[in-house]
Amino acid sequence: MVGESAIGVRGLVKRYGAVEAVRGIDLEVARGEVFALLGPNGAGKTTTVEILEGYRPRTGGEVEVLGVDPGLGGRAWRSRIGIVLQSGETTRELTVRDTLRLWAAYYPAPRAVTDVIDLVGLGEKADARIGRLSGGQRRRVEVGMALIGNPELVFLDEPTTGFDPEARRQFWGVIGGLRDLGTTVFLTTHYMDEAQALADRVAIVKDGQVVAEGPPGELGPGRDQAAVITFVLPDGSQASDLPAGLGGETAVNGRRVTLRSERPTAALGELAVWAARHGGELAQLTVSRPSLEDVYLELTGAP
């Protein structure tokens, strides 16, 4: 079903009694891709991920992960994936190095412990006990435990929850390192800036269904992808003097103009010529597009 894809899902359904938690989800994740699954609490994200990981049976649909039905995946299949849960426990008395050595013993062809320590950025803490690490550093150890088996695919569930901004950005570098290695990453997160910064593609789920899928910068209906141009009218000009061919929607509040345009480059060119003819500059000029967070809030109906 999936061919060269790492994950293929068709018509996935999961019911709990009369409650349908997942309602016909379709997904495809390419090998080597960083893919983010987004959605509010109760949208079906966790159930979907647990089915992909082989921890939960499905009610209906087809699922393949690395070419195997996860419901039938055995030890050999599990050795090809790594999983980082939202919260995990490690033995506080062991060092980082000893922890990874212990986990390496479970796999037939593990990565070198020193390579994994370097990958997760813990070289200076390799011989420190887990109990003496910060929360962000312990999270890196958990990622190292998921990577020590040299997996083709890694699931990261809310990997930076509780991190301070600096620790989050440092952890993003770890994800970048996985991409460089060609490892497929399936990520869930409530941080839209994290998904926008890391993911090649995202899927947004609501009420057990995918409501949007694609690169973070290309989601949402056409109107929501319009650029927003704002500026202050030059002295001596009026909004009624603006070029007629700008297109889009124009709103005027005093001397401030807000223009939504599907062709911002052309609109800016026309505005620049118009401003020059009126002997002024477009003061306080800004051009922006909706962020992934804007699109997410619109699609999920979040307040």
Protein language model features and the residues they cover:
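C-terminal coupling/interaction segments
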Residues: 2, 264-303
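Non-catalytic surface loops within mature trypsin-like serine protease
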Residues: 31, 124, 233-235, 263, ...
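Solvent-exposed beta-strand sheet faces enriched in polar/charged residues
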Residues: 10, 232, 251, 286-288
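ABC transporter nucleotide-binding domains
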Residues: 4-9, 14-206, 211-212
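A generic structural signal for secondary-structure junctions
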Residues: 82, 104, 108, 221-225, ...
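ABC transporter nucleotide-binding domain
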Residues: 171-262
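Short, solvent-exposed polar/charged micro-motifs at secondary-structure junctions
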Residues: 125, 240-241, 260-262, 294-298
